[in-house]
Regions:
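Short, well-structured N-terminal submotif of metal-dependent ribonuclease cores
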Residues: 1-42, 48-60, 123-127
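Active-site neighborhoods of divalent-metal-dependent phosphate/nucleic-acid chemistry enzymes
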Residues: 2-5, 67-130
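Conserved short-loop catalytic and cofactor-binding motifs
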Residues: 15, 46, 64, 85, ...
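Residue-level signal for well-ordered alpha-helical scaffold segments within enzymatic catalytic domains
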Residues: 19, 46, 50, 78, ...
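Charged/polar, solvent-exposed surface patches and flexible loops
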Residues: 30, 49, 60-64, 78, ...
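Ligand-binding grooves and catalytic loops that recognize ribose/phosphate and carbohydrate rings
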Residues: 54-66, 73-76
Length: 130
């Protein structure tokens, strides 16, 4: 019997997209080429709040990516409590990304350059491992 290995989708954090605007991020380019990069609505919103010439083009490109649904607020709040995400010095959008990765049936990994978010993603077993 032959097993089929399906590469996991990856939920990409805002800081990775911002860095990609300034200098190409190879891993992100590869994930996009493999159709594995997912865009979260809150990340797209954060990118929209940015400025610069590249912002409009990036927002247009992000709209072309496969999306991921935002879990209900009550589920996010429950996971924040259950997994002790509070007091870890991550922001709310970061906590939402972590919870989304844990709830979504595809179990996407989280790709970030943010140290605190990465630490929590590793702790919760949802960090992108390359």
């Amino acid at each position: 019997m032959t097993g089929v290995c399906v590469a996991k989708p990856v939920l990409v954090d805002t800081c990775v997209w911002v860095e990609h605007v300034h200098r190409e991020v190879d891993v992100l380019r590869r994930l996009c080429a493999e159709s594995r990069a997912l865009i979260h609505p809150d990340v797209r919103g954060e990118v929209m709040l940015g400025c610069g010439e590249e912002r409009d083009l990036l927002v247009k490109r992000l709209r072309l990516l496969p999306g991921i649904d935002r879990p209900p607020q009550v589920d996010i709040e429950s996971l924040v409590q259950q997994h002790a995400i509070a007091c870890k010095r991550v922001g709310w959008v970061d906590a939402v990304l972590l919870c989304t990765a844990m709830i979504d049936p595809r179990r996407p990994a989280v790709l970030t350059f943010d140290r605190r978010l990465l630490r929590e993603a590793i702790r919760l077993g949802v960090a992108f491992a390359g």
